[in-house]
A protein has these predicted regions:
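A helix-centric hydrophobic-segment signal that preferentially recognizes long
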Residues: 2-182
């Protein structure tokens, strides 16, 4: 009888211990996915100064756009918390959209080979960033689901695991931008 009791306790401990390990593993997957998002955000931030310099040659009087990009880039690179990084990345995205829309007003710029190469690199980076955001959000969903269920919620409370924040698009990012060819 005693042996059964110990065996039952041992099995229960092992089964619930696996739940703790799963939460730890999922938290690490979230962190890994976030580092890939950061990697692509950094790639974008490194690419933009070259794009800005190319555009400046054609659109010197568009100082406001260049200031917006510089400020947004500085905010993104200086952000420390995940929430701040997400917010500044969305702000940076809006500034990049303004820069890209400038090319519509300057046909010579659109024809510039360096500008085209940089735009192709930016498009590739944006695609990779979209993929990494999706992977990050999927990892967050799995993790958050597990720490809200049983026995994950118990282990989350014991281990101090809290919910992770999704990478959400800024409100303006959901609207289709207007492009004018006048």
């Amino acid at each position: 009888m005693r042996m059964r009791k110990y065996a039952a306790i041992l099995i229960l401990a092992m089964a619930t211990g696996c739940g703790y390990n799963r939460i730890v593993s999922e938290e690490q997957q979230v962190e890994s996915a976030w580092s890939q998002v950061e990697n692509q955000l950094q790639r974008r931030a490194d690419l933009i100064p070259n794009l800005v310099e190319t555009v400046k040659g054609y659109a010197r009087h568009e100082k406001g756009v260049f200031d917006d990009i510089a400020n947004a880039r500085a905010a993104m690179l200086g952000a420390s918390s995940r929430a701040d990084k997400i917010q500044s990345a969305n702000q940076f995205e809006g500034a990049i959209s303004k820069l890209i829309s400038l090319s519509e007003a300057y046909p010579q710029l659109k024809a510039d080979a360096n500008f085209q190469r940089l735009m192709d690199e930016l498009a590739g980076t944006e695609n990779r960033l979209a993929v990494e955001r999706k992977r990050y959000n999927e990892a967050v969903q799995q993790y958050n689901t597990d720490i809200k269920g049983v026995p994950g919620a118990w282990w989350a409370k014991i281990g101090g695991f809290g919910p992770k924040e999704y990478f959400k698009a800024e409100g303006g990012a959901k609207a289709v931008p207007k492009v004018s060819f006048q």
